[in-house]
Amino acid sequence: MKIKNKEKGQVSIEALLLWAALAGMIGLFTPAFAHAMDAYTLHAHTNQFISFSETLQETISGISFAAPGTQTLLQVPPIENMTIEVSGNEIHLTLAHAQLAHDKKRTITSAWPIEGTLTPGEKIILRREEGKITIQ
């Protein structure tokens, strides 16, 4: 069966209309999909932030009562918008994001002064020394 020129044109127009409808549907759902992915990423970062703060609190508590010279290795997760400040006997963790109603804040306390810095995405060594805890 041969397709005539007029029918070829009709098939081409129908194919273009189908492709245009498909592109329109993709364009319609892309923003909704992007928003869902942003919400999922924020939820994952928040859970990771809470988990890390609990792990850090347990580690600091354990090493605070250990003998001088005791050390442990800890991975600081690379969480976007997380700030870490070390001040005296406390480590202040903050997760700030425009979609959060309030910043998530955690304070880790120690029986000893803490010296050093924590950088997101790096491994650190917590070492109990005489009268203090150092972060390397």
Question: How should each PLM-predicted stretch be described?
Answer:
Residues P31-Q136:
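N-terminal export/assembly leader peptides and their processing motifs that target proteins to secretory
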